[in-house]
Every structure is written in C-alpha cells, then in structure tokens.
C-alpha cells in the first residue's frame, strides 16, 4: 500500500468507509462468507487473508474487532450457491453483511465485487492488497468460514473439510469419489456433479 490506502480519498472527505470481501467463492463445498468492516482513518497491519498463516489470521481477526468502528458477516449457504450461482450468492451474502452492520456506511470498497449501491464505490481487482479495510474484511470472512468448515468436518467426517476448507484438492476429489457429495456440497460444480450419489437428495 505504498501509494496510500485505496479508501484514502473517502477518508479525506470524512466519509465512513465499509470494506467488503468474501471467502469461499471457488470452493466445492460449504458457504460463501462476506465480511464487512468499517475502520477509522489510519494505518493498519492488515493484509490479504490468503497471504497469512491460520494463526496470524486468528490474531489479526481479534485486532480487527478491537479497532473497527463496526463489523459484520453475511453467509450464503451451499444450497443458495446452487440455486443462485456464485456471483448472485456472493451479492446476497454481501447484502446480509451490510444489513447486519450496526452503522450506515457512506462509501464502499470491495475486491472486484460489483455491488448494486447508490453509495460511492471502489471495486478494483486485488483491492485486498491496496485497502486495509478490505483486507480486514477478508480476514474476518476467512476466519469465520474456516470455523464453519471445521464444524462441517465434524458433521460430515471423511471429506477433510477442516484441512482443505471445501476447496478442490486431490484429497477432496478422492473423498467425493468414495463417499459421494455431502448435503453441503455445491451440486452445480462439475467435480461434485460428476461424483456418485451416496446421500439422499434434499426434497
């Protein structure tokens, strides 16, 4: 962020800026989680969650909660991803996160997510590398989703959800072929759709 944070022009105008980012868009299983964070103007140690170790993410998630003016999370379940598609489900999770925010932001920054909003919006690619607010949202979303996947690992053992977090790995592919899709797999994703059914279909 050598050129200054992405949200700096909004901060200079005195606007409350909410940063949003998601976790889980490309996973084969589990929800999409969107974090939203409002930070006061300043310099922060937050970086894209994908560049951090799990321990560092957990530590920084607590720091985000300490310094944020407000934060919230929104979730779109796997069944909603199947029904709506990835983009619309991500937008739904973002809407839920914003509705849960205890204050009203005056500008938004997202990581290339085209939110329909009347507010001033910046949504460049790789915003989580240029915006501490988006990076903070990324950290909260990733930590929350990882906890959900650890719980799903207990509910549906054998898939390795706690390790690969629902993403496509050789281990996950082998488990799908051996066990079939679980109720939290995204049936529209080709590797899942091609796996043999073992669980009963939801009504």
Curated annotation (Swiss-Prot):
E.C. designation(s): 3.1.26.4
Named cofactor requirement(s): Mn(2+); Mg(2+)
Primary role: Endonuclease that specifically degrades the RNA of RNA-DNA hybrids.
Sequence ranges assigned to domain RNase H type-2 in this UniProt record: 15-201
Keyword Mitochondrion included in the entry's annotation: no
Cofactor note: Manganese or magnesium. Binds 1 divalent metal ion per monomer in the absence of substrate. May bind a second metal ion after substrate binding.
Protein name, per record: Ribonuclease HII
One family name in Pfam for this protein: RNase_HII
Localization, UniProt: Cytoplasm
Chain sites annotated for binding a divalent metal cation: 21-22, 111
Catalytic activity: Endonucleolytic cleavage to 5'-phosphomonoester
Aminoacyl-tRNA synthetase listed as a keyword: no
GO biological process terms held by the UniProt record: DNA replication, removal of RNA primer; mismatch repair
UniProt family annotation: Belongs to the RNase HII family.
One GO cellular component, as annotated: ribonuclease H2 complex
Gene Ontology molecular function: any one: RNA-DNA hybrid ribonuclease activity
Keywords assigned by UniProt, alphabetized: Cytoplasm, Endonuclease, Hydrolase, Manganese, Metal-binding, Nuclease
Species in which this protein is naturally found: Thermus thermophilus (strain ATCC BAA-163 / DSM 7039 / HB27)
């Amino acid at each position: 962020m050598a050129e200054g944070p992405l949200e700096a022009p909004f901060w200079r105008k005195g606007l409350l800026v909410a940063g949003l980012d998601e976790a889980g868009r490309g996973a084969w299983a589990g929800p999409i989680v969107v974090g939203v964070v409002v930070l006061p103007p300043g310099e922060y140690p937050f970086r894209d969650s994908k560049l951090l170790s799990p321990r560092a993410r957990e530590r920084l998630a607590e720091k985000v909660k300490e310094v944020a003016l407000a934060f919230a999370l929104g979730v779109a379940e796997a069944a909603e991803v199947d029904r709506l598609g990835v983009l619309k489900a991500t937008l739904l999770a973002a809407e839920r996160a914003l509705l849960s925010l205890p204050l009203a932001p005056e500008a938004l920054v997202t990581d290339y997510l085209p939110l329909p909003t009347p507010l001033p919006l910046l949504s460049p690619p790789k915003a989580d590398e240029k915006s501490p607010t988006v990076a903070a949202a990324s950290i909260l979303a990733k930590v929350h989703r990882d906890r959900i996947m650890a719980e799903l690992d207990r509910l549906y053992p054998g898939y390795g959800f706690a390790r690969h977090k629902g993403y496509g790995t050789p281990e996950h592919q082998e488990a799908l072929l051996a066990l079939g899709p679980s109720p939290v797999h995204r049936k529209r994703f080709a590797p899942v759709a091609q796996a043999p059914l073992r669980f009963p279909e939801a009504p």
